[in-house]
Amino acid sequence: PIQDVIDLGIPGLVTRAINLAETDNASLIIFDIDTFGGRVDAATQIKDAISSTEIETIAFINRRAISAGSLISLSCDQIYMTGGATIGATSVVDMSGSKQSEKSQSYMREEMAATAEKSGKNPDIARGMVDEELSFEYLIVEGDTLQVDDIEGRKEGKLITLTTELAMKYGIADGKSESIEEVLSSLQIEDYEIITVGENWSENVVRILTNPTVSSLCLLYTSDAADERCRG
């Protein structure tokens, strides 16, 4: 599962899961995703790991794939979403929630577009998840050109965030399923064994230490300790 904050412990988990799947000659890898996002560097490491495997990959968005979660989902070959799920809103922000520089936005905008394009998704919609200033008159969805009055449900000047139904309409999601078993049924896979890969102790330690709150406390403790030494 790829859940909660995307931190530097998750790339190790994803890479280990992919290596295990390749060793066991698995036919499919499903990533169970529910996240509001996290670190850009961790997300790009995860994206690179997923993109590098020859095994078919599926993102199962179990409620939400926001910010970094969108990039990870788009790196998979297919996307399935539960009813009422969301994907999008991928602008790069700092820990205070303030928008980062145009350089950072430009990088993420094209990273999202390239990732979507590689997976056969619409790169312009992916760009719009990062850049609120983009608008649309035409979209190519599954080879058909659609005339649109911007993205349905999108408020003016806002990042694109798609519900399950809209993600399917615009070709971002491949289907709707309420469980991994339903995903497999949709793919007409009947004879299967599900192997779940969870965090090991080292990945869990990295997740704890790179959690923004814990990192801030460590930094504060280090600063206070330095002050004590100076006074001593």
Regions found by a protein language model. Give the residues of each.
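Conserved small/polar residues in nucleotide/adenosyl-binding loops
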Residues: 221-228
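Soluble extramembrane regions of membrane proteins in the secretory/endomembrane system
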Residues: 1-206
